[in-house]
Structures are given as C-alpha cells and as structure tokens.
C-alpha cells in the first residue's frame, strides 16, 4: 500500500497509464487481425491497403514504447511476408 502522497499519486497514474496502454495494445491486435483477415480473403489490393494502415499503427505504438521496437519489426516482417506470399 502506498504510504506517501507521492506514492499514492504514482499508483493513480499507473492505473491510468495501464488502461491507456492496454487500449493501445488492443488496437495493435485489431490491426494485425484485419491484415490477416484480408490476406485470408485473398483480396490483394484490400490487404495491401490494410497492411499500410497496420504498419502505421504498429510504428506509432512502438514509438510510444508500448511494445518493443523489435516486436514491432517482427509483426511488420511477418505480415509483409504473408502479403507477399499472396501474390
């Protein structure tokens, strides 16, 4: 239990930051799923458009250090490979 005023404030901030970061991670998962769904549907043009939007989302979340930059690179690489295999 936080005893000092500073510790109580940091605990409040941590709860708020955790909620925001969880939301951002959910956005990431949704973006990745959208690309995978478009690839499974076999629509290359739609998949390419969704892929570009997804890459933007992944990079933005990595820049905010919500996920590690290597994890972001791994996601982008695997999605790009799946998109390329569709051709």
Swiss-Prot record:
GO cellular component, as recorded: cytosol; small ribosomal subunit
Chain spans, region Disordered: 1-29
MF terms (GO), sorted A to Z: small ribosomal subunit rRNA binding; structural constituent of ribosome
Classification via SUPFAM superfamilies: Ribosomal protein S20
One GO term of the biological process aspect: translation
Entry keyword RNA-binding: yes
HAMAP family (alphabetical): Ribosomal_bS20 (MF_00500)
Keyword ATP-binding recorded: no
InterPro entries named in the record: Ribosomal_bS20, Ribosomal_bS20_sf
Known function: Binds directly to 16S ribosomal RNA.
Compositional bias of kind Polar residues: 20-29
Keywords: Ribonucleoprotein, Ribosomal protein, RNA-binding, rRNA-binding
This protein's name: Small ribosomal subunit protein bS20
Origin species: Herminiimonas arsenicoxydans
Family per record: Belongs to the bacterial ribosomal protein bS20 family.
The encoding gene: rpsT
């Amino acid at each position: 239990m936080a005893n000092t005023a500073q510790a109580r404030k940091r605990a409040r901030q941590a709860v708020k930051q955790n909620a925001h970061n969880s939301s951002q991670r959910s956005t990431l998962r949704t973006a990745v799923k959208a690309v995978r769904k478009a690839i499974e549907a076999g629509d290359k043009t739609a998949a390419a458009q969704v892929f570009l939007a997804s890459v933007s989302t992944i990079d933005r979340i990595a820049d905010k250090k919500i996920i590690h930059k290597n994890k972001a690179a791994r996601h982008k690489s695997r999605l790009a490979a799946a998109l390329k295999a569709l051709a």
